């Protein structure tokens, strides 16, 4: 039952991002709710789905799918500092990919944005890959796999 709840939460969280951001639904919702209303609805739904996802993961049974080699834990520990640097760099001012940003007023990309346009997505991609490599259970595959699918730049 707990694995089913985790799977449904992962589908709603990941699918909700794709559905609400789709070019055919988003404009309709923005027209009906306004930009701020849409962002409020989107944020509230994703926050609820994410909380459910984490709650379900914490309660999921451990079902081993494979036994990760010890080196995978070292790989995860090696990738996490890079993921953290990318995440912190993405929170810098003048982020062309942040909600409400006006890219035309940002000028030449600087800092981490001179390296990649989406440092936060790369941070989550590395984070998910590192955790998938270091964990071999069904709940981890569902959680980290769904976040990887969402984060792939």
Segments from the language model and where they lie:
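Membrane-anchoring alpha-helices and their flanking helix-loop junctions
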Residues: 1-117, 122-153
């Amino acid at each position: 039952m707990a694995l089913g709840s985790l799977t449904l939460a992962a589908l709603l969280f990941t699918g909700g991002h794709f559905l609400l951001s789709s070019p055919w639904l988003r404009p309709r919702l923005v027209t009906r709710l306004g930009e701020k209303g849409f962002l409020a609805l989107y944020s509230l739904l994703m926050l609820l789905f994410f909380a459910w996802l984490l709650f379900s993961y914490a309660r999921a049974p451990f079902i081993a799918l494979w036994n990760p080699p010890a080196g995978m834990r070292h790989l995860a520990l090696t990738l996490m500092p890079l993921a953290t640097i990318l995440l912190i760099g993405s929170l810098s001012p003048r982020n062309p990919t942040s909600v409400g940003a006006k890219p035309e007023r940002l000028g030449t990309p600087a800092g981490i944005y001179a390296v990649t346009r989406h440092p936060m997505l790369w941070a989550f991609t590395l984070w998910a890959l590192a955790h998938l490599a270091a964990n071999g259970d069904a709940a981890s595959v569902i959680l980290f796999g769904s976040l990887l699918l969402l984060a792939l730049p």
